[in-house]
Amino acid sequence: VFDSYVNKTLPQKVYVESEYINNFLDSTLYIKTDYEKSKRVFQGIEKNICYEALYNSYNAFLSNEKDKEVYILKYICNGFDVGPKINNMLTISYVFKVINMKKRSLSECHKLKGLLRFQEIAPNFCYSSIHPDNNIIEPLGHHFINRLPTMNFIIHDKIREICFIYNTKEYKIIDSKNINIPS
């Protein structure tokens, strides 16, 4: 977002490095993750657009929607230009798309908050596996930290092969491919 907004260029496609297949016809630009720039973007969105835009962007990013990064990028860059009214500009396709991606992610997360069941796999240690359409493991995990603050637990997203692990003090989201998890 930072580089795109500063350089006034919007890419046609955004790839995660591990998913990119080199194509000689494309003009590519590799952008390394820069936590200082991302911090500035987060603060800038909240200050210059509104908290709702940050919330919408985060929850839309959890979506499994194809090309979500481009929609979110356009939404944020335009938001920096027009401010909080970006959220009411639903006739613009990428704004509409971001709002709908957010709604789908939040809806699925809400549904799983009620449906998820843990099983005790060791004393004071619970496990649950999920197969969500969207990457909602972090907000779902935070919900259960608030509900079960004294319980150690793992929520295993079997689709993405990641786990939300909470030990009553802190949480981590880790790759589940290399750890022994019950079937």
What is the predicted role of each segment?
Residues V1-E36:
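N-terminal ordered "arm"
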Residues Y15-S18, I31-S183:
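Extended, charged helical/alpha-beta scaffold domains that provide interaction surfaces
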